[in-house]
Amino acid sequence: MSLLTEVETYVLSIVPSGPLKAEIAQRLEDVFAGKNTDLEALMEWLKTRPILSPLTKGILGFVFTLTVPSERGLQRRRFVQNALNGNGDPNNMDRAVKLYRKLKREITFHGAKEIALSYSAGALASCMGLIYNRMGAVTTEVAFGLVCATCEQIADSQHRSLRQMVATTNPLIRHENRMVLASTTAKAMEQMAGSSEQAAEAMEVASQARQMVQAMRAIGTHPSSSAGLKDDLLENLQTYQKRMGVQMQRFK
């Protein structure tokens, strides 16, 4: 796996699923391929994206700044600086300075990542802030190692939270989660079907599913009534794909 592929993998692991994630993935691919060289426009686009947490925007802004060539006098962006200040906690800043001193002596991506993984996400973000604000300089490889370690820390906590939700025995949470997944699947079906003339049937199924979820929420239904909703939708989607000559069995 190449260095940039690894960086893209880690960064995308902390972005919530949805159309925006696909858009960000495309921007990262373009940046890493040298196709997008307007850092100012890229940062303005990132700043106005909805849904993303300030820290995720800060990390993406840091990656774009590391990768896209820019004029030396280009101003640092406030939204990135604020996200990478470790919540203003002096303990985070102290640890970030110690980490920076270690990273300065490191030259490899994996070496930097190993060192950084023993620090908290707050200290890692603060260390990125030091580098972003030009208060410290490390090689691009080392900076990418720091980025990936930070993303791994964040993804670990997100995974723990997701696992807790999936494993919950609370029927109301499970019911709502199934309806959210069904609604998201229906939206994806509508997007996939939208570019085809034979899509009327798939669009109809997706539309009915979304109306059903809305009705279930409006009137309040038994928690078991949502069981199998998403799987039924996916079966419809795969039937439609087979008719279109597309063989994708990876959704479940």
UniProtKB/Swiss-Prot annotation:
Q: Which cysteines are joined by disulfide bonds?
A: none
Report the SMART domains cross-referenced here. Answer: Flu_M1_C
Assigned keywords, A-Z: Host nucleus, Membrane, RNA-binding, Viral matrix protein, Virion
Instruction: Add the further remark from the entry.
Output: Most abundant protein in virion. When expressed alone can form virus-like particles in transfected cells.
Please tell me where this protein is predominantly located. Answer: virion
Regarding protein family, the annotation reads: Belongs to the influenza viruses Matrix protein M1 family.
Task: Give one GO term, molecular function aspect.
Answer: structural constituent of virion
Q: Which parts of the sequence form the motif Nuclear localization signal? A: 101-105
Q: What does this protein do?
A: Plays critical roles in virus replication, from virus entry and uncoating to assembly and budding of the virus particle. M1 binding to ribonucleocapsids (RNPs) in nucleus seems to inhibit viral transcription. Interaction of viral NEP with M1-RNP is thought to promote nuclear export of the complex, which is targeted to the virion assembly site at the apical plasma membrane in polarized epithelial cells. Interactions with NA and HA may bring M1, a non-raft-associated protein, into lipid rafts. Forms a continuous shell on the inner side of the lipid bilayer in virion, where it binds the RNP.
* Region ranges (Membrane-binding): 1-164
What is the name listed in the Swiss-Prot or TrEMBL entry for this protein?
Answer: Matrix protein 1
Q: Give GO BP annotations, semicolon-separated.
A: viral budding from plasma membrane
Its annotated compartments are: Virion membrane; Host nucleus
Q: Which GO terms describe its cellular component?
A: host cell nucleus; membrane; virion membrane
Self-association or partners: how does it assemble?
Answer: Homodimer and homomultimer. Interacts with NEP. Binds ribonucleocapsid by both interacting with genomic RNA and NP protein. May interact with HA and NA. Cannot bind NP without genomic RNA.
Q: How does it sit in the membrane?
A: Peripheral membrane protein
Give the span(s) annotated as RNP-binding. Answer: 165-252
Which HAMAP family does this UniProt record tie to the protein?
A: INFV_M1
